[in-house]
């Protein structure tokens, strides 16, 4: 412990006495105002007291730093043998200590308790003796490694960190890096792996020595972390979507934007936040306000702009296309569709049930394909025929016009054959006219009668005395000659289907058999 404090004092004296090359970073720091001698002495006394306290903690706790497999760290709190620092590295360390002292003065002025929280470079030297390499600048061979840490190694096993931790790093075996002159901070620490190097920093920036001896200045990782946290907070408050907010889900709900619904009616500048409000405004102000029986749409850009109409309901339905309101919602559960007109809703609702029927029909062929047996094929054929019979006829040609045509033909047929008026519905009444007359050798007079309707009965010669009886002749429909009866009407002797004819014959034979018994 005494050797470490002596080395620290020698390091400070060398840093004050050694000249700095022009243009080096230390020259700018040396140009700053140095603190008074009394304050320096007080700070040195505080540093020595803190160093002794840390050494006592290290010796009592027995915490040792992890030394590398080919590195320069030793365990158990043993002091590491240090080589004599070069003038350039000593001057650089002195400059670093001057900067630390200036920063300590500023923190003492801002907070009375700041001096107790900060730790000097002597503490880092003593802490490094418990398991870290020296804070002196040394050049290492490619096969060797050194591990450096802040004052946090001595306190890690005793108390929890109070402030933000510095960067903790561990390198692989056989790596080489330059040691760090740490300015000290709140609980900054670094742990060295097997032959690895680790750097630590506190709240203030640390100086890292490169291989060529020039200091490399970098910002604390805590500052960058805090700035990142502030960016995330501002992003969350503004409602923007960031990858940090997504949490692996791929998307987040962004803040809803207010969409303005403007009324484009002539000489109307109203603006609304929703389409239902705009629709109510149009209906109450512009549609219901029109009087006189003539209704026009004065929406700017409308294809029927200023076109008069006598239907107010048409104008109300038409204005729904301008307002974008869809008040007619689907009544089927789970469907969120809405429509601007009731007709659109009426066309939409049956699609739900047609989809269900189609899904059932589509599931049936799958079941059929699974069992393509002969019995299944016969069953399918029967179902197909049954379905075909049960289906109604798509076309019905017996309409009113066809009925009028049949009635007209029946009237004409009755006028010629008198079936309904004189034949009692089953006989045809023929009327005769004399078309010829002759006198035979015996002196008798013969008359040639022609029957009406024509071409059904043949002409016949009768005696003149029989003329009065044969003016009319009634013939049953079944007695008419079949070759000429079709001329009377084609439906009288209509051909019967073969199956129906067989059925009729079987019934007649059965009735005849029953009558004989």
UniProtKB/Swiss-Prot annotation:
Organism name: Homo sapiens (Human)
Compositionally biased region (Basic and acidic residues): 152-163
Biased composition (Acidic residues): 36-51, 94-121
Gene symbol of the encoding locus: AEBP2
Function: Acts as an accessory subunit for the core Polycomb repressive complex 2 (PRC2), which mediates histone H3K27 (H3K27me3) trimethylation on chromatin leading to transcriptional repression of the affected target gene. Plays a role in nucleosome localization of the PRC2 complex.
ZnF (C2H2-type) ranges: 261-286, 300-322, 328-352
GO cellular component terms listed in the entry, alphabetical order: chromatin; ESC/E(Z) complex; nucleoplasm
Segments of this protein annotated with the region Disordered: 1-229, 352-394
Phosphoserine: residues bearing it: 18, 24, 141, 206, 210-211, 390
Family assignment from sequence similarity: Belongs to the AEBP2/jing C2H2-type zinc-finger family.
SMART domains reported in the protein's UniProt record: ZnF_C2H2 (SM00355)
Protein name as catalogued: Zinc finger protein AEBP2
Polar residues bias: start-end ranges: 352-365
PANTHER family found in the cross-reference section: ZINC FINGER PROTEIN AEBP2
InterPro entries attached to this UniProt entry: AEBP2/jing_C2H2-ZnF (IPR052130), Znf_C2H2_sf (IPR036236), Znf_C2H2_type (IPR013087)
Gene Ontology molecular-function annotations: DNA binding; transcription coregulator activity; zinc ion binding
Biased composition (Basic residues): 377-392
Region Interaction with RBBP4, annotated ranges: 209-294
Quaternary structure, from the entry: Self-associates. Associates with the PRC2 complex, which consists of the core components EED, EZH1 or EZH2, SUZ12, and RBBP4, and various combinations of accessory subunits including AEBP2, JARID2, PHF19, MTF2 and EPOP. Found in a monomeric PRC2.2 (class 2) complex consisting of at least SUZ12, RBBP4, AEBP2 and JARID2. Within the PRC2 complex, interacts directly with SUZ12; competes with PHF19 for SUZ12 binding. Interacts with EED, EZH2, and RBBP4. May also interact with RBBP7.
Chain intervals for the UniProt region annotation (Interaction with SUZ12): 407-478
Subcellular location: Nucleus
Keywords assigned: Acetylation, Chromatin regulator, DNA-binding, Metal-binding, Nucleus, Phosphoprotein, Repeat, Repressor, Transcription, Transcription regulation, Zinc, Zinc-finger
């Amino acid at each position: 412990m005494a050797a470490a404090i002596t080395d620290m004092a020698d390091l400070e004296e060398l840093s004050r006495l050694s000249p700095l090359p022009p243009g080096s970073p230390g020259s700018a720091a040396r140009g700053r105002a140095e603190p008074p001698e009394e304050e320096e002495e007080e700070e040195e006394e505080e540093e020595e007291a803190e160093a002794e306290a840390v050494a006592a903690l290290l010796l009592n706790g027995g915490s040792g730093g992890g030394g590398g497999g080919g590195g320069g760290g030793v365990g158990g709190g043993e002091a590491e043998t240090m080589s004599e620092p070069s003038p350039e590295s000593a001057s650089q360390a002195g400059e670093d200590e001057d900067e630390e002292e200036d920063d300590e003065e500023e923190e003492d002025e801002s907070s009375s308790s700041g001096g107790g929280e900060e730790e000097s470079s002597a503490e880092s030297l003593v802490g490094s003796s418990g398991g870290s390499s020296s804070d002196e600048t040394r050049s290492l061979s490619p096969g060797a490694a050194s591990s450096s840490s802040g004052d946090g190694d001595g306190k890690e096993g005793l108390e929890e960190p109070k402030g933000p931790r510095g960067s903790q790093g561990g390198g692989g075996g056989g790596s080489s890096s330059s040691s760090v002159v740490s300015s000290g901070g709140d609980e900054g620490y670094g742990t060295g792996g097997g032959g690895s190097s680790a750097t630590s920093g506190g709240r203030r920036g640390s100086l890292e020595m490169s291989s060529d001896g020039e200091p490399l200045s970098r910002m604390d990782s805590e500052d960058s972390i805090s700035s990142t946290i502030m960016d995330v907070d501002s992003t969350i408050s503004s409602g923007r979507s960031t990858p940090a907010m997504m949490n692996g889900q791929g998307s987040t709900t962004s803040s809803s934007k207010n969409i303005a619904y403007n009324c484009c009616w002539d000489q109307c500048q109203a603006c609304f936040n929703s389409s239902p409000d705009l629709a109510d405004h149009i209906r109450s102000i512009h549609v219901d306000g029109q009087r006189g029986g003539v209704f026009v749409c004065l929406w700017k850009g409308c294809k029927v702009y200023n076109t008069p109409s006598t239907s107010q309901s048409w104008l109300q339905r038409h204005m729904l296309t301008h307002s974008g309101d869809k008040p007619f919602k689907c009544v089927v559960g789970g469907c969120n569709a809405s429509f601007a007109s009731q007709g659109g809703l009426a066309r939409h609702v049956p699609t739900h049930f047609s989809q269900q029927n189609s899904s059932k029909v589509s599931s049936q062929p799958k079941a059929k394909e699974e069992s393509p047996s002969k019995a299944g094929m016969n069953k399918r054929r029967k179902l197909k025929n049954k379905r075909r019979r049960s289906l109604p006829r798509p076309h019905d040609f017996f309409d009113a016009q066809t009925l009028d045509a049949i009635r007209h033909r029946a009237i004409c047929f009755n006028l010629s054959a008198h079936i309904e008026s004189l034949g009692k519905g089953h006989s045809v009444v023929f009327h005769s006219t004399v078309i010829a007359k002759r006198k035979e050798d015996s002196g008798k007079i013969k008359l040639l009668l022609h029957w009406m309707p024509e071409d059904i009965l043949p002409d016949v010669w009768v005696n003149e005395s029989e003329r009065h009886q044969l003016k009319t002749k009634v013939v049953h429909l079944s007695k008419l000659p079949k070759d000429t009866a079709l001329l009377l009407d084609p439906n009288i002797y209509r051909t019967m289907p073969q199956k129906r004819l067989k059925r009729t014959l079987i019934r007649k034979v059965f009735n005849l058999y029953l009558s004989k018994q």
